[in-house]
Each structure stands twice: as C-alpha cells, then as structure tokens.
C-alpha cells in the first residue's frame, strides 16, 4: 500500500487502489541542456533571462545606493578622459608639458561641470543604459529613488507615514476643540447654579404678590411652631399652576383607581355567579 513512508495507509475513500504506480521523488531533475521527461516543467532560455532581469531589478530597488561609489565612478571617467587626451598630445609631440597640462586641466573642469549639471537634471532610464544599470545596482537604486520621489510629490504624500497616520487625527481633534464653542452641559449648568456667586441672581419665575403671599404663610407657620423651611430671598415659592396640575393629577388617579375597583368587583360577581351555576344540579 505505501512505500518508504509515502502513500496511503488505507485505500478507503480515495477512489484508488492505494498502490503507488511510480516514485517521482526518486528521479533526478533534468538540466536545461538535457531536457527529458520534465521538459514541460522547465523554463525556456528567454523566460530564464526575463526572470533574472526582474530579480536584478528588484534587488537593485531594495538595496540602498552608495553615493561615494557613484562619485568615485564619475571622477574615474573624468580622469580616464584626461589621461587619453594627455597620451594623445604627448604622442603628437607638438606641444610642451605646460601646454599639455593646461589643456588637460581645462578638459577636467569642463567634464566636472558637465557631470554636475547631469546630476541636477533628473533623467529616466533609457533602453541603451538598461544593461549598464543592471550591472551597476547603485546607479539603478538612485534612479529608482528619484522615481519614487516624483511619485510621492505627484500624489502629495508625506515622507513620514507614522506621523501622517498618528498625529493628524490628534491635531484635527485639538483644532476642532479650540474652534468649537464651549458646550453648556447639564452638569455645568447645575454647578453654576449651585455656586454662591449665582445664588442671588437666580431668575424669579413668579410675580411679587405671590411671593409676598407665600412669605406671609411661612411667617404664620413659624409663629405657630409648625416645622417649615426658612423663608429668605433664596427660597423658591411653589407655582399655583404646578399645584393645580398636581391636584388634577390626583383627581385623575383617584378616578382611575375607583374605576379599577369597580371593574374588579364586577369581575368577582360574574365569577361567583358562574361558580353557583356549576354547583347547581342539572334540570334533567
């Protein structure tokens, strides 16, 4: 059923006999030069080259460029051009050493200024430089970074994503709190009303005559010795409208309770009559 720990321990539910027909894992993978049974699993030469180029490009994009190496490469090119000019003038033999050195220095200054201008101008990758960029990953990394900077500027995104994600909501909330007016909540209103500076300025809801009448009643109660609250300017008199509303509410509650008791009495009487009928003998 199984061979070398490979296979099914039981054929039940597998819709097969459970026996291994071939052992593919024991066969060596054929090379690209000698394609055999596994040729359809292999990549062609063109696909292999395309994959290698993609890997090199990704590798160059991930790695950071070394600025010193690029600067050294530019200086080396300048010195190579100067040495070629110096060798050419020395072979001709028409000029002296001072003139040759002066021309070489002039060429060196010109090439240095030219390369400095090329660094300031952002250039894209051309097809002629693709092979050179694939070999020099530092240069490819610099150009890739320039492309990413242009993309970031185009989409107007910040360089520090953590600051953009964490600080922006907090700053927005802080600005909204500063701009929004102070909310007059119920707790703050009650605290201001309880404060001693506002007790004397509490709005008077009722007329003066009603307040005088209530103060007279309170003074009479104090004279009779009945317990009551101290009458002062800060005590609130009861509204006659509130008293009438409470009186009407009490009357309605009494009428409702009276109706409920009447319904309960009628219900009990009906239940008693039904019980009497059930106890009475049948007429036949």
UniProtKB/Swiss-Prot annotation:
Keyword line:
Coiled coil, Cytoplasm, mRNA processing, mRNA splicing, Nucleus, Spliceosome
Q: Which GO terms describe its cellular component?
A: cytoplasm; nucleus; spliceosomal complex
Q: Could you tell me which Pfam families the record lists for this protein? A: cwf21
Q: Where is the CWF21 domain?
A: 70-114
The Gene Ontology biological process annotation of the record reads: mRNA processing; RNA splicing
Record keyword Cytoplasm present = yes
Where are the annotated coiled coils located? 71-118
- InterPro entries xrefs: CWC21, mRNA_splic_Cwf21_dom
Localization recorded for this chain is: Cytoplasm; Nucleus
- Keyword Nucleus attributed: yes
Q: Basic and acidic residues bias located where?
A: 148-196, 229-243, 250-284
Q: Which family does the similarity line name? A: Belongs to the CWC21 family.
**Self-association and partners:** Associates with the NTC complex (or PRP19-associated complex). The NTC complex associates with the spliceosome after the release of the U1 and U4 snRNAs and forms the CWC spliceosome subcomplex reminiscent of a late-stage spliceosome.
- Report the function annotation for this chain: Involved in pre-mRNA splicing. May function at or prior to the first catalytic step of splicing at the catalytic center of the spliceosome. May do so by stabilizing the catalytic center or the position of the RNA substrate.
Name this polypeptide is given: Pre-mRNA-splicing factor CWC21
UniProt gene name: CWC21
């Amino acid at each position: 059923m199984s061979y070398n720990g490979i296979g099914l321990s039981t054929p039940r539910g597998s819709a097969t006999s459970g026996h291994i027909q071939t052992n593919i894992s024991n066969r060596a993978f054929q090379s690209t030069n000698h394609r055999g049974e596994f040729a359809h699993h292999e990549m062609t030469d063109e696909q292999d080259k395309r994959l290698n180029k993609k890997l090199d490009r990704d590798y160059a994009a991930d790695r950071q460029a070394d600025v010193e190496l690029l600067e050294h490469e530019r200086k080396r090119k300048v010195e190579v051009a100067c040495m070629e000019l110096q060798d050419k003038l020395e072979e001709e033999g028409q000029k002296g050493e001072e003139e040759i050195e002066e021309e070489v220095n002039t060429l060196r200054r010109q090439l240095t200024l030219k390369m400095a201008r090329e660094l300031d101008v952002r250039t894209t990758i051309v097809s002629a430089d693709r092979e050179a960029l694939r070999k020099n990953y530092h240069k490819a990394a610099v150009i890739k970074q320039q492309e990413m900077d242009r993309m970031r500027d185009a989409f107007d995104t910040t360089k520090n994503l953590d600051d953009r994600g964490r600080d922006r909501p907090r700053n927005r909330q802080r600005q909204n709190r500063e701009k929004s007016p102070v909310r007059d909540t119920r707790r703050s209103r009650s605290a201001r009303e309880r404060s001693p500076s506002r007790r004397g300025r509490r709005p008077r809801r009722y007329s003066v005559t009603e307040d005088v009448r209530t103060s007279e009643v309170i003074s009479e109660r104090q004279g009779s010795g009945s317990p009551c609250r101290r009458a002062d300017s800060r005590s609130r008199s009861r509204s006659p409208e509130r008293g009438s509303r409470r009186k009407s509410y009490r009357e309605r509650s009494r009428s409702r309770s009276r109706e409920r008791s009447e319904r309960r009495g009628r219900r009990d009487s009906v239940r008693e009559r039904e019980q009497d009928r059930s106890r009475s003998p049948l007429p036949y």
